[in-house]
């Protein structure tokens, strides 16, 4: 029996009344853009796209050539379809409405065009993260303020990971599903329906080099993980860290674990490292739809009311019992 394609999956979701035709077509366009990005990434040094672009983004981060190229691919692919009202990206200071010569649709698209791009030059898996919101009714020219919706308002979220194989992981609010790109055919085929994150885990992903900058609750939590079966947790834990959120979260969706990027004192003015709107929110929706959990260490990420397009948050996501344990350390410390 042949595997269902992404196209068939989306049409069946539409027939079941879970999505409309416009959202189906938007996801199809995003998936096509991801195929183009996958081709560019896979060429590596042969494509002349490695290295810095010589520019910076709104976060003050140096842009890689592939950051800029991936951003341009997503913008161009979504400009003319008629399903989108505006886009927002990690690589752009402000949101961008669709060009006036094209019809405007009902949706807002946010994306990190190439997450983990600092790993590109060393050939580590990277990916595209995206989130879809509905434009508020009556909005003719959406601005940044129209994107400021809590993650619970997402109608779709996903990422495309460019690794040994290219995979699109998608949720439309009814489970999390993985599609693998069949390169000869050029189609994404369903390879894992209804992904499930185990409730329990003994694996965590964190950048331990920042340990000295963590708050006491975070120090205590990781200290107990490191103590293993001789400590308060009573079992041994393994640590993994790829420094590519897409790659780390993909591992967690596949076999469980907890991904952590906490607040730290290196720059106390920043509430976290990862961006809420196009990193934390879509990844949180994917993980929750797979039975996991996602918090800031104190509150559910999807409940946060954003105040800025490029707002940052701490992130704890993955196996729900371990996320609950990490959150408990922080809340108990707040009460002390």
Curated annotation (Swiss-Prot):
Signal peptide: none annotated. It comes from the Bacteria. CDD domains: FBPase. Keywords: Carbohydrate metabolism, Cytoplasm, Hydrolase, Magnesium, Metal-binding. PANTHER family: FRUCTOSE-1,6-BISPHOSPHATASE-RELATED (PTHR11556), SEDOHEPTULOSE-1,7-BISPHOSPHATASE, CHLOROPLASTIC (PTHR11556:SF35). It holds the Pfam family FBPase. Its main location: cytoplasm. This is Fructose-1,6-bisphosphatase class 1. It comes from Xanthomonas oryzae pv. oryzae (strain KACC10331 / KXO85).
């Amino acid at each position: 029996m042949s595997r269902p394609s992404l196209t068939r999956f989306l049409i069946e979701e539409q027939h079941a009344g879970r999505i409309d035709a416009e959202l189906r077509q938007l996801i199809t366009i995003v998936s096509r853009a991801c195929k183009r990005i996958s081709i560019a990434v896979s060429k590596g040094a042969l494509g002349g796209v490695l290295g810095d672009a010589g520019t910076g983004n709104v976060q003050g981060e140096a842009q890689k050539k592939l950051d800029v190229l991936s951003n341009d691919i997503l913008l161009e692919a979504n400009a003319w379809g008629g399903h989108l009202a505006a886009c927002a990206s990690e690589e752009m200071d402000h949101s961008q409405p669709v060009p006036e010569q094209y019809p405007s649709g009902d949706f807002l698209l946010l994306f990190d065009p190439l997450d983990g791009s600092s790993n590109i030059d060393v050939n580590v898996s990277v990916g595209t993260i995206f989130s879809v919101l509905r434009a508020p009714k009556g909005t003719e020219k959406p601005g940044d303020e129209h994107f400021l919706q809590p993650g619970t308002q997402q109608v779709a979220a996903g990422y495309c990971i460019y690794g040994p194989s290219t995979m699109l992981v998608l949720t439309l609010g009814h489970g999390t599903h993985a599609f693998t790109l069949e390169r000869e055919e050029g189609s994404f085929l369903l390879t894992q329906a209804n992904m499930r994150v185990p409730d329990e885990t003994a694996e965590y992903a964190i950048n331990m080099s920042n340990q000295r900058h963590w708050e006491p609750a975070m120090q205590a939590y990781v200290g107990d993980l490191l103590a293993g079966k001789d400590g308060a947790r009573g079992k041994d834990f393994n640590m993994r860290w790829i420094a590519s959120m897409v790659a780390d979260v993909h591992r967690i969706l596949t076999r469980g674990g907890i991904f952590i990027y906490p607040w730290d004192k290196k720059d106390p003015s920043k509430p976290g490292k990862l961006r809420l709107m196009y990193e934390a929110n879509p990844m949180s929706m994917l993980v929750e739809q797979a039975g996991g959990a996602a918090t800031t260490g104190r509150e559910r990420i999807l409940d946060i009311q954003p105040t800025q397009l490029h707002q940052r948050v701490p992130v704890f996501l993955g196996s729900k019992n371990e996320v609950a344990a990490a959150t408990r350390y922080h809340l108990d410390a707040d009460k002390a």
